[in-house]
Structures are given as C-alpha cells and as structure tokens.
Amino acid sequence: MKVKLLLTAITLSCLAIDVLAQVSISGKIVSADTNEPIVGANIRIDQSLSGCTTNDKGEFSISNLPDGKHVLRITHVSYTPKSITTKGGEKNLLIKLQDSFTNIGQVVVTGTGTHHRMTDSPVPVSVITAKDLSNASVTSLDEALQKLTPSFSSMTNGMGTTLSLNGLPDDYFIFLENGKRLYGDGTYARINVAKIKRIEILNGASSALYGTNAIGGVINIITDDAKNAINVSSDTRYASKGRFTQSVNADVNTGKFGSYTSYRRQQAEGWQLNPYEENSKTHELEETGKVASTGFYANTVNQKFTFDATDKLSFYARGGYYDNKTRRPYEAYDYNILHETFNYGIGTQYMISKGNYITADYYADHFSSSYCFFKDNKTYNGKAGEEQVRKRTRNHNLSIKGIFKLGGRHKLSVGTEYIVDVLKSQTDNIAKEEAYTLALFAQDEIKLLRNLQALIGVRYIYHENFKNHATPNVALMYKPGKFNFRASYAAGFRTPTLSELYATDIAKKNDRLTIGNLDLKSEKNNYFSLSAEYVHERFSVSVNAFYNNIRDMIDYNTIATGDKAMEQYGHKEVRQRDNIAEAKVHGINVSANAYLGAGFNLSGGYTHLNTQDVELGQPIDKSIKNAYNINAQWAHSWKIYRLNINLNGRFNSKRFSKSYGYAPEYQLWNLNTRHSFNLKSVIIEPGCGMENLFDYMDDRPYNSNYATLTPGRSFYISLSLKFKS
C-alpha cells in the first residue's frame, strides 16, 4: 500500500512539474521591406512537434512548450526562410523576413519522407503553391495540374476523365494527402482546392517509399491546417454553363485541441460541342441529345480533430464524405451515375529526440458506384426509379514508420505497411474478392561531403496473389554554389487491381465486352533521370531528362470477334486484359521562373515526350508529344488594396488514342484578376476573368476524341472572404 501511495505521489509530482514547466512563445512576423504583417507564415519548433501559422495580422502564439531555449524556423512561400533562438516564455517577438522572388525557401517532404528545402532535396520535386492556385483561379485539382504544369494532360470521354503524367495514365502514379496515400476511384476529384497549401510533384518511379502504382510519379497534396485560434473563410466562384463552386472552411485551435472542418459544393450544367453523332453502321451523321460534358453536382465534407498531448506527442482523427452524381438529359439517357466515398483514419506521432520520431497511421476508404435509373434499361435490367450498385471497393491501410538520425551523416527511414483491398460488384456477379499486401521498407539519406549527398532505399513486398517483390532506388545530388545536379535510378512495380483481375465492362456503342484475367502478372519498370538546376534570388531554371521502361504492361487483347464472339459471349467483340505490352518513355522537362521587377513575374514550362508501345510500334494510349505553359503576373499594393493580374497559357500537341485516333492540338489562354481589400476584421477578395480568350472549341461530332471540352470563351466572377481572428 505504501509503495502504491509513493508511486502515485511521484507521478502526480512529475505531472505538476510538467504543467508548471509549460511556457508559451508569441509574436508577430512582418516584411523587412514594408513592415506589413505576413499572413500564413509557418513556424516550427526544433526538437518538437509544435508549430503554427501566422494569422491575418501576422501574429502567432505557440503554447505548451517546455521551459528553456527553443529554435524557431520560419518559412513562407514568398520570403527567405529564417531561424531564430528564443528563451521560453518570450512574448511580443518581432520577426522580419526578406522577400524571396523565386520560391527558394519552399520546404518539401515528397520523395524522401523527410523535410528539405526544395533546393536541398536529393530527388527533384516541383511545387505548386496556394498562391499559384489563387492566381490561376482554379477550382479542381486536375485543372490546377494541367494549367500550371506541362507534364500533365487529360482525356475525357463517356467513362470520365483520365489524367496522364509524362505520358502515363493515372493507374501509374499515386496521390497522397499530407503524405498519406489516397485510395479508391476518382481520388483527385475529392480534393478541396481551397484547403491546399501546396502540391508537391515527384516525376518518376518511387515504389521503394510509396509502394505499388508509383511507377510514373507521386503527387502529394499538403493541406492548410492553420493552428490559429479561429480561422473562417469562404470561397465562391461562378462561370458560364452553370459552373458553380462554393467552399467553406472553419478551423478552431485551443492549444492542445484542434478542429478543422471544410465543405465544398460543385455543380455544372452539361453541354454539347456538336448536336450530331456518327451512326456506327451507316457512318452517317444523325442528331443526338448526348452531351460531351456531363452535368453534375458534387459535395465534399471533411473533418479532422487533433490533440497535442505534449510538444512531442500528438494524435489525430479524421473523416470525410464525397458524392458526385451526373445530371444527364432525359431524352438521351436512361440513368445517372452516382459515386460515393467515405473515409476515416486515426494516427499518432511521437518525437523521441531531435530528428528522431515514430508515426503510426490507419486509413480506410469505402467507395461505391451506382446506376440511378430514370428509365427502364435493358442492358443492366434496370427499372425506372431503381438504384443499382455496380461496384464497391474497400481499402484499408495500416502503417508504422520511424525516422532516425544516425550521427551527423545519416537519416534513416524504416517502416512497415499492411494493405487490404476488397471488391464487390452486383453487375459483374462478384460477391466479394479481396487481397492483402505486406510491405517492409528502408531508406537512408547520406551526407557524403558538404556539397554531395546520396539516397538509397529498398521496399520488400509480399502480395497475396503475386507473392514476393523488391524495388530499390538510389539518388545522388551535387550542389556547387547556386547549381544543383541530380542523378537517380528507381525500380517500380504495379500489381493488377482486383477490377483488372475480375471485373467486366460493356461498351454499348460498338457492343464490345471486356473481361478480366486471373493470370495477369505485375507490371515492372526501370526509371533513370538526370537533372540540372540553377537558382538565383530573382530567377531559376531547371532541366530534367528521363527514361522509363515498363515491362509486362497490362493492355487489351482481342480474343473473339464476329459470329464467334456472338455465339460464345453474346457480343460483337470480346477483349481480355493481358500482359501484352512493353512501353518506353523518354523525355525532357524544362521549367523557368523570373522576377522582372516592378511587380512582374514570368514563369513557364515545357515537356517533350517520346512514348512507344513496343509491341504495336505506336505511341502509348492517351499520350502527347509536346506541351508548354506560360504564366505572366503583375501585382501591386495601394495601402489596403492589392491588385493581381495573371495571364495563363497552355499548349498541347496532338493526343493519341488507340480507340479514337488523334485528338487535334490546341492552345488555351486565360486572364484572371483578383482585388484584395485588407479591412480591420475581414479580407475581401473579389475576382473576375475570362477563360479561353480566343474562343477555341473542338466542335467535331459527339464521341470524337476531343482535344478539350471547353464550351468556348466564358467569363467568371469569384469572391473570397477571410475573417480575422
């Protein structure tokens, strides 16, 4: 009994000491040139998980810190990073940051899993900032990627939109949100652009760190979970064809507890580019009510709670819901399509000591796709008013990761991951199919010399159906002065999805049946890259050359046509997924950014690709050869008013499609303006602009391989409100 009382007394004493030792640091961050407050600056505490962002007055406050000295690291996309040492309990700090015109201090985590300035990362990572998104007035992630990076292109048809990165479709690259992989269909459609802090883009294979599907690249969306007391904002945008987006964000932080809530509503009318379509039998044009761009409405709700038990131990819980339902014209269709997703996750992070910490995360994603019939339908035996679930997928991911500094030259990342995929389909008569994957990975960042560093990693995989596999990667970076030279090699792999193994699909226009294949093998690749970069205070330029060789690529193999297909399968053509292709992609990415003075910025990028399906001697499906983008911006402030004018241009060469032939080349130009009024309690930011300045429209008959679905020249208005705490 005495022992228990003694232990209890000691525990309570330690807790009391810990509480008494807690201190706070607060202050204000301003521009060194103008003394104006800097909004959205990030402050991190060394040897701690604590941090925050400045509010609309440039103020910050970090509590629950142990007494003693602390190193504050301050970063902002428009300013040079700064570090200062403070004593515990300091109040009213005034920190001044110098302007940075070329994003020189941007911090990234993609590619290594650890924090680096972008110019210090051993693997080349490009970044799209929240400022870039706002200047371009984008409303969706796929729009942002295409407008602001020439490496991305897209193709939209009756089955939806497919993004491509450096010639490879979206089956070959993955999306992360704050470093956590997103699963399910249409992942990028669920992202609320209003919450994005930055987008980090890693070109090339990275399966060693991120697992299957990371053959072509990784896109990591970093969201803005500001740690101020209260943050409330609203973003509204309306354009022609009923294109409406409304986002509302409400964040509350009480020190230890945080709540982050966001809602987004999107909707649009459908439109035709041509009122005619080609009859598949007579090849004559006939009138149609079918639309090239389908009307829809979509809702996204996300909630996240955080709890910082100490400055070294934190927890979170998150959940989200997304739905997207088409609005097809009654006279031309029998049903609408409804996609629904809900996801949830929990996690914790514990900092053992400076540079050493452990994270544990669990994430689940539940996706369903349904036919909502408003007429009777023979193909799917649907009745008007019925809803038929065509597919359900479940993804569960449990991961544990540790990062450890070993001496002054090594930073080791090790971890394990367990994934379960589940597929159900009423239309395909799939009661339930599932598979699990177990992975172990390790990666070491090595500082060889002062200007020379290396990265070496490997991932071991055991898949329930495809057994053992290992993927290594290695990267080298030499940094003399303002130059960065990088070389890398990575092996990647992609296991066939459950849909590719089991699911079927019917193309009604040409009566074609696609069936699965249980004998599929994993796709594998080797990726090589060389890059050079020069970074100056007022301009930067980078060049990246790469080669990607993919083996056992899954494609379609026609197994029956005509009478044989009708007799055996009841369709005119039957094809099966098979490992029949080898693909090669080599290309070059060039990007440049310059501050011209007097508020003028100019940036641009160019991508050249040579893609080849080796078996067929033709380009890879949905790939393009050349693309470039240009962004010109001017900004100026007059006391409480700031004007921002942005001109954006995008050029695409012809895009290849195995089914439809080439889509024509095109270019689109957009003019955007933002007008910011920094008032006492709110920042009011109206905007207006013109999309597709030169009124380009691909008006070929319905079901053509359209270059783009733009309805022609259109105007938009927007309004952003940010309430000050």
Give the residues covered by each predicted segment.
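Gram-negative outer-membrane beta-barrel transporters
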Residues: 408, 447-453, 547-549, 569-655
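Periplasmic-side early beta-strands and strand-to-turn transitions of outer-membrane beta-barrels
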Residues: 227-229, 237, 252-337
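Outer membrane beta-barrel strand-and-loop segments of large Gram-negative receptors
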Residues: 294, 389-391, 395-401, 433, ...
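Short, acidic, small-residue-rich periplasmic hinge/interaction motif at the N-terminus
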Residues: 30-34, 41-46, 73-79, 87-134, ...
